């Protein structure tokens, strides 16, 4: 952690700018989860459940 602090001081980056950047990065991760990961997961679960039902009903005939 000390190395990062020294890097910020040497690069003349303010703590406010570093904080804003970190908040933006976390916000991007949350947005990606909401827009991509969660819908894709729900779709894959839905498809796998339907496939399981189709295989089960086909096997009984």
From Swiss-Prot:
Transmembrane segments: 26-46
Entry keyword Transmembrane: yes
Keywords: Membrane, Photosynthesis, Photosystem II, Thylakoid, Transmembrane, Transmembrane helix
Any Pfam family the entry gives: PsbX
UniProt GO BP: photosynthesis
One GO CC term on file: photosystem II
Major location (coarse): membrane
Topology in membrane: Single-pass membrane protein
InterPro entries associated with the record: PSII_PsbX (IPR009518), PSII_PsbX_type_2_subfam (IPR023428)
Cell compartments where the protein resides: Cellular thylakoid membrane
Keyword Transmembrane listed: yes
Subunit structure comment from the entry: PSII consists of a core antenna complex that captures photons, and an electron transfer chain that converts photonic excitation into a charge separation. PSII forms dimeric complexes.
Family designation: Belongs to the PsbX family. Type 2 subfamily.
Role description: Involved in the binding and/or turnover of quinones at the Q(B) site of Photosystem II.
Protein name per UniProt: Photosystem II reaction center X protein
Species of provenance: Prochlorococcus marinus (strain MIT 9215)
